[in-house]
């Protein structure tokens, strides 16, 4: 590996990079709290399963044609750093990423860093 982007980001921001997120409108959440919380629980379980059962996950990825080969998928899973941040850990990681973007160009995050209402913390509910 010529350059480990995860390590480089950790050196820059102090946390691992955020490469994806789940976004829910506040009005949708207010009307569907149970469903959203269940989705987050199942999503977290899927991440745990993927990391603990990489060969089986790779077979499923090939079966459902997400990746053409289970062998390729299994090699990729190990390098993907698949995680599910929730609550305070999610906010810490997201804020670090957004701060780097903001410092480079405030317009990249809408001109200001998000406030408390941007983040969902199930631990505080």
Describe the role of every protein-language-model region.
Residues 1-61:
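Pocket-lining segment of extracytoplasmic ligand-binding domains
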């Amino acid at each position: 590996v010529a350059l480990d982007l995860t390590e480089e980001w950790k050196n820059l921001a102090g946390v691992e990079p955020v490469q994806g997120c789940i976004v829910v409108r506040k009005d949708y959440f207010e009307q569907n709290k149970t469903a959203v919380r269940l989705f987050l629980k199942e999503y977290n379980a899927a991440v745990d399963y993927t990391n603990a059962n990489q060969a089986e996950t790779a077979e499923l990825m090939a079966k459902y044609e997400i990746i053409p080969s289970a062998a390729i998928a299994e090699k990729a899973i190990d390098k993907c750093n698949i995680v599910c941040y929730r609550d305070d850990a999610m906010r810490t990681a997201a804020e670090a990423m957004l701060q780097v973007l903001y410092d480079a160009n405030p317009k990249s995050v809408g001109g200001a860093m998000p406030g408390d209402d941007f983040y969902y913390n199930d631990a505080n509910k």
